[in-house]
Amino acid sequence: MSSETKSEFGTKSAWLYNRTGKPKDVLYLEKGLHIPNPAELGPYDVLVEVVATSINPLDYKLMNTYQMIAKALFKLPNIPGYDFAGRVLAVGSEVKEFSATQRVWGCQSFPRAGRQGGSCATHIVTGDKDVWHLPDGVSFNEGAGFGIAGLTAWEVLVRQMKVKPGTKLVIEGASGGVGTFAVALAKALECEVTTISSTENLDLCKSLGATHTLDYKKDNLVERLADLGPYDFVFDCVNDNVLYRASSKFVKPDGAFFGIGGDITLSYVGSRLSRTLRPRVLGGSSHSYYNILLHVDQEMLRDFVDFVMKHNIKTVIDSVYDFEDTVEAFNRLMTHRCKGKVIIKTD
């Protein structure tokens, strides 16, 4: 590193991958990376010292997708991760909302993560519309967990479903990162919530506000949902085609499915297109199926955190790992047994 580019903030460390594969096979830690000086920031950039990050299934699915897809989506080597919480170090010349030392949380935009890298690092340069203030009393670990999981739940329930008091809702995969936020948000929005999870997670779902808790290991889900329904919406967090095909038995005629999850493969894309486009006479369902692609904006960040503070909604944290143990954090996430969020602390 030349003296002309030496940063006043020192250097950063980051986890990177330069080929596709499982995290344990492709992730490596690199130290001594350059941190931009204030003069090097774009006008709307915010430089954040990351205190905690959380990881999501999207992170390892992108890492483990086809090489040709990876090259089309992002620049290699790439830093994985989208969610973060930390302290502002410097801002661009046009940034008015933030200043140095402020506590913030955010979600790196997909295009920026592809070009410049994500949040599995000690420092991140993000856009001023992709970050918001972290309220007093909220820990960095909790704030890091808001990100994709909390905002996806908010997008589906508030912006897409537009739920209101009395809305009847099924949440499948209710004990994961998105699911736990969805249950808590739906409860605060006065919905009637039926959750689907494993036996060991029934109590967690109940504690978050579920009206009814179903066990996918023991219950006949279609029969139980038919008894408890009909429902306005189903929020599918696990990519379950079986429930969708049986939806006429428990979803109202004008109801709909909203889905996330699934691998980034051609077969997955085909199954999603089938659910979205295939008519009932060809084996599909009469209900609409909406695939959720999250687009974060500052209004969403602000509204979400205001709501969770008002209703005392907490991030459910499954586990916390040191930065050096990031590969182990991914291994935990990939068990599909997490109760809430997996957090990585960087300090």
Swiss-Prot record:
Protein known as: Zinc-type alcohol dehydrogenase-like protein C16A3.02c
InterPro entries named in the record: ADH-like_N (IPR013154), GroES-like_sf (IPR011032), NAD(P)-bd_dom_sf (IPR036291), PKS_ER (IPR020843), YIM1/Zinc_Alcohol_DH_Fams (IPR050700)
Subcellular location(s) of the protein: Golgi apparatus; Endoplasmic reticulum
Source organism of this protein record: Schizosaccharomyces pombe (strain 972 / ATCC 24843)
Assigned protein family: Belongs to the zinc-containing alcohol dehydrogenase family. Quinone oxidoreductase subfamily.
Alphabetized GO MF terms: oxidoreductase activity, acting on the CH-OH group of donors, NAD or NADP as acceptor
Coarse class of the protein's main subcellular location: Golgi
Keyword annotations: Endoplasmic reticulum, Golgi apparatus, Oxidoreductase
